[in-house]
Curated annotation (Swiss-Prot):
UniProtKB keywords: Aminopeptidase, Cytoplasm, Hydrolase, Manganese, Metal-binding, Protease
One biological process term in Gene Ontology: proteolysis
InterPro entries, alphabetized: Leucine_aapep/pepB, Macro_dom-like, Peptidase_M17_C, Peptidase_M17_leu_NH2_pept, Peptidase_M17_N
Organism: Vesicomyosocius okutanii subsp. Calyptogena okutanii (strain HA)
Protein name: Probable cytosol aminopeptidase
Catalytic reaction annotation: Release of an N-terminal amino acid, Xaa-|-Yaa-, in which Xaa is preferably Leu, but may be other amino acids including Pro although not Arg or Lys, and Yaa may be Pro. Amino acid amides and methyl esters are also readily hydrolyzed, but rates on arylamides are exceedingly low; Release of an N-terminal amino acid, preferentially leucine, but not glutamic or aspartic acids
One of the record's GO cellular component terms: cytoplasm
Lineage: Bacteria, Pseudomonadati, Pseudomonadota, Gammaproteobacteria, Candidatus Pseudothioglobaceae
């Protein structure tokens, strides 16, 4: 799919189709289109589309009218309109089309280009059956966007983000017998070779030498060897890097604290944090900003076995702090805490961990916003700002002493869960915060946003867009 910009009257475009937009107050400025909208009782609601054939005055074969809802046009309604358009374009097998320029309140034209490319590329992603993997092809070959600008940077960035999201979704959708810790390591190595990045993979023996007793307590019940994967992009000399840590539990049975059987197949998605940081690295490696980025993936499988960790076991983390494992199904924090200690070697500017960490965040925030926690107000505000630009929402949750005290243990420095069923997402974040001394840190709980269930089951690619925007915002701050 190729994107171009052109300053041309849309009626003059010769192609398979053109896309125009309509909202509750105004319709596309063409008498024939306005009459056809009235005749078809088109109400311009977001997500509604009207397909018109051989419209007088248009050189394209078909015209697609997409609703934008009430004025002023919102970014979210524009995204809904684009997603609806893609469905029609695929149905009519359009190869060459033009999209009308639309002004979005609060955003500039570069952003419109970026979001258009990102949404239209991402909307064509298809979940593929195992053993029948093919290069994604929607049939759409060229999309021309009406614009008075010459810069294609927004288009390039949007396509790169969609490419990173596609990698994240593909990894998440793979079955856990394919996407193992070793598979994630292989993917990182392939990215390093493709984009000339630095890659290091620590094996179990290396982690034992480093004293990662918490991480290894999770992997010990599985026949799949654990991996600690790091991938580095250097775009700005010796500047302190942004470090992203992605939880990579390639399958989470719960361990000895076994999960219920219903829906357990979806626990292959417990590595979506790791998948997302690989997706972000793919984006950054293509955009090539002047910044340093390191992504770290603690990758394990959590399984029950005769040698698996048991409730009540006490383990020693890389930090030297001891942890009482009250629930082996609260394993994500056990691998992340050692990774958060390990990343100090990179002398980070900031560290953000991304994890499908708690079911409690789904209860609190549903599938719309990822949970955000941070030990630094400015960092949290930067992430919130990036979420608004990227339309990849977050909602901040507190870190306070009252919640942290719930992790008290009589037998270790801390327990891996709180003493009650309350505030599960917050106590998980408090647990992680105990391992982040010495650097600015934020935590994204993506358990509700990383994938969807039901008939359209599949990974979403979130929060690749958010993290990319955050990184690019940091680049701008340093200019």
């Amino acid at each position: 799919m190729k994107f171009t910009l052109i300053n041309e009257i849309i009626q003059h475009f010769k192609g398979d189709a053109v896309v125009v937009f309509s909202n509750s107050n105004t319709v596309f400025n063409d008498d024939n289109i306005q009459q056809l909208i009235k005749l078809n009782h088109f109400d311009s609601k977001p997500g509604k589309v009207l397909l018109l054939n051989l419209v007088s005055g248009f050189k394209s074969k078909q015209v697609i009218v997409s609703g934008l809802g009430d004025a002023p046009i919102s970014a979210k309604n524009y995204v809904k309109a684009l997603n609806a358009v893609i469905v029609i374009l695929v149905e009519i097998k359009a190869k060459n089309l033009m999209v009308q320029h639309v002004g979005i309140k609060g955003f500039n034209e570069l952003w419109v280009h970026e979001i258009t490319a990102k949404v239209m590329c991402n909307a064509t992603y298809k979940v593929q059956k195992v053993g029948n993997y093919k290069k994604q092809n929607s049939g759409i070959e060229r999309i021309t966007i009406q614009s008075t600008m010459d810069s294609v940077y927004g288009l390039m960035k949007g396509q790169a983000i969609a490419d990173g999201m596609s990698l994240t979704r593909h990894l998440g959708d793979l079955p856990s017998n394919v996407c193992t810790p070793s598979y994630l390591a292989g993917t990182a190595i392939s990215l390093a070779q493709e984009f000339n990045l630095e890659c290091e993979v620590l094996e179990e023996v290396d982690m034992e030498k480093l004293g990662m007793g918490s991480l290894l307590a999770v992997s010990k019940g599985s026949s799949e060897p654990p991996k600690l994967i790091s991938l580095s992009y250097r775009g700005n000399g010796n500047e302190k890097p942004i470090v992203l840590v992605g939880k990579g539990v390639t399958f989470d049975s719960g361990g000895i604290s076994l999960k219920p059987g219903t829906g357990m197949d979806e626990m292959k998605y417990d590595m979506c944090g790791a998948a997302s940081v690989l997706g972000v690295m793919r984006v950054i490696a293509q955009i090539k900003p002047n910044i340093n980025l390191v992504v770290v993936l603690p990758a394990v499988e959590n399984m029950p076995a005769h040698n698996a960790s048991k409730p009540g076991d006490v383990v020693k983390s890389m930090s030297g702090k001891t942890i009482e494992i009250l629930n082996t199904d609260a394993e994500g924090r056990l691998i992340l805490c050692d990774a958060l200690t390990y990343v100090k070697k990179f002398n980070p500017e900031v560290v953000i961990d991304i994890a499908t960490l708690t079911g409690a965040v789904v209860v609190a925030l549903g599938k719309y916003n990822s949970g955000l926690m941070s030990n630094d107000k400015n960092l949290a505000n930067d992430i919130i700002s990036a979420s608004k630009v990227s339309l990849d929402g977050v909602w901040q949750l507190p870190i306070e002493d009252e919640y942290d005290e719930l992790l008290q243990s009589n037998f270790a420095d801390m327990a891996n869960i709180g003493g009650s069923s309350e505030a599960g997402s917050i106590t998980a974040g408090c647990f992680l915060s105990r391992f982040t001394q010495g650097y600015r840190w934020a935590h994204l709980d993506i358990a509700g946003t990383a994938w969807v269930s039901g008939d359209k089951k599949g990974a979403t690619g979130r929060p690749v867009s958010l993290l990319t925007q955050f990184i690019m915002d940091q680049v701008q701050k340093r200019l």
